[in-house]
């Protein structure tokens, strides 16, 4: 049955060394409920754990294989996985990176994390380490990583990950957009002090627990009162708000209205305008760049997400 999955992955253009890793790992060993083997090796999402309180899925294999392909996963690499679930994807990646590589997988649910630990131990997989906790903090003791591989929807790529990623390292990540409630995946490469990357495709993952899923609430605490500065008319304001969300990591919301909570100012986003209180040079610079790019949506832009630097966009991908 695993051979069937191998050929499905090959149809997606997946490299042999990645597709073959799926041949080596029995997916059924990571499922807590019984499925017919013919179903297990379909290219579909499967529920891997559900006790009525906590829930985990085994992601669609072709999507995981494409993620591995896009980050260039290969022998000897060190990978930080966020959202380990019951361990199947980490186990597959362990075969791709080989004995000299390492997969460090973080799972927020302690109950599910312990299941994942038992699963890889039972199969004798020695180059996977499971850490039970909030993936927001990464796992600094095993850094730097060549790849950060995210299999849950997150609100941001936190600075902790940026710090733990090698220069030139890659991040593949589904990001929860607060306005449209979409969950597009992005591929980024570290070029200090930026993550530079672009949109890849639409996804739908379980939303991360902990700090990776509560950015609106955390940013709400940053809101302060500043004197009114000025009002600027906005074309296609919903697109600009999503760029602010992706690039600044400072978006929040109160009663259906979105705000940028900056260090020296606040921006209120309305249907066709934005109101600036205090100073918000990051937003004004971003607006100028966006206008010069023809008001394009993020799918058609290159994103430069700054860490201790203003984020910006470029018009060509």
UniProtKB/Swiss-Prot annotation:
In terms of temperature dependence, the annotation states: Optimum temperature is 85 degrees Celsius. Highly thermostable, with no loss of activity after 60 minutes at 100 degrees Celsius. Enzyme activity is observed at temperatures as high as 93 degrees Celsius.
Tell me, what is an example of a GO biological process annotation in this record?
Answer: protein repair
Instruction: Give GO MF terms, alphabetically.
Output: protein-L-isoaspartate (D-aspartate) O-methyltransferase activity
HAMAP family, from UniProt? PIMT (MF_00090)
Spell out the protein name for this chain. Protein-L-isoaspartate O-methyltransferase
Question: Sorted alphabetically, which keywords does the UniProt record give?
Answer: Cytoplasm, Methyltransferase, S-adenosyl-L-methionine, Transferase
> What EC number(s) has UniProt assigned to this enzyme?
2.1.1.77
Give compartment(s): Cytoplasm
Which residues does the entry assign to the active site, renumbered to this chain? Answer: 59
Subunit structure, interactors included: Monomer.
Species name for this entry? Thermotoga maritima (strain ATCC 43589 / DSM 3109 / JCM 10099 / NBRC 100826 / MSB8)
Superkingdom, natural source: Bacteria
Annotated catalysed reactions? [protein]-L-isoaspartate + S-adenosyl-L-methionine = [protein]-L-isoaspartate alpha-methyl ester + S-adenosyl-L-homocysteine
* CC per GO annotation: cytoplasm
């Amino acid at each position: 049955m695993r051979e069937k999955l191998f050929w499905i992955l090959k149809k997606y253009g997946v490299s042999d060394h990645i597709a073959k890793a799926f041949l080596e790992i029995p997916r059924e060993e990571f499922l807590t409920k019984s499925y017919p083997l013919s179903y297990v090796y379909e290219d579909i999402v499967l529920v891997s754990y559900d006790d009525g309180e906590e829930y985990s899925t085994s992601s669609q294999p072709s999507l995981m294989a494409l993620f591995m392909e896009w980050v260039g996963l290969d022998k000897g690499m060190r990978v930080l996985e966020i959202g380990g679930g019951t361990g199947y994807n980490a186990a597959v990646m362990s075969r791709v990176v080989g004995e000299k590589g390492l997969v460090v997988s973080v799972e927020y649910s302690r109950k599910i994390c312990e299941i994942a630990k038992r699963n890889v131990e039972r199969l004798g997989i020695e180059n996977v380490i499971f850490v039970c906790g909030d993936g927001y903090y990464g796992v600094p003791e095993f850094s730097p990583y060549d790849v950060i591989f995210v299999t849950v929807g997150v609100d941001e790529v936190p600075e902790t990950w940026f710090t733990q990623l090698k220069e030139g390292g890659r991040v593949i990540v589904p990001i929860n957009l607060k306005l449209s409630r979409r969950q597009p995946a992005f591929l980024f490469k570290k070029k200090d002090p930026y993550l530079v990357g672009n949109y890849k495709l639409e996804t739908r993952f379980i939303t991360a627990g902990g700090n990776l899923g509560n950015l609106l609430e955390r940013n709400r605490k940053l809101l302060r009162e500043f004197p009114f500065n000025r009002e600027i008319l906005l074309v296609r304001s919903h697109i600009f708000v999503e760029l602010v969300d992706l690039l600044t990591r400072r978006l929040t919301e109160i009663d259906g209205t979105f705000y940028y909570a900056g260090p020296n100012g606040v921006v209120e986003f309305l249907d066709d305008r934005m109101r600036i209180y205090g100073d918000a040079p990051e937003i004004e610079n971003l607006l100028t760049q966006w206008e010069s790019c023809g008001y394009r949506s993020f799918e058609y832009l290159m994103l430069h997400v700054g860490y201790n630097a203003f984020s910006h966009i470029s018009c060509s991908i």
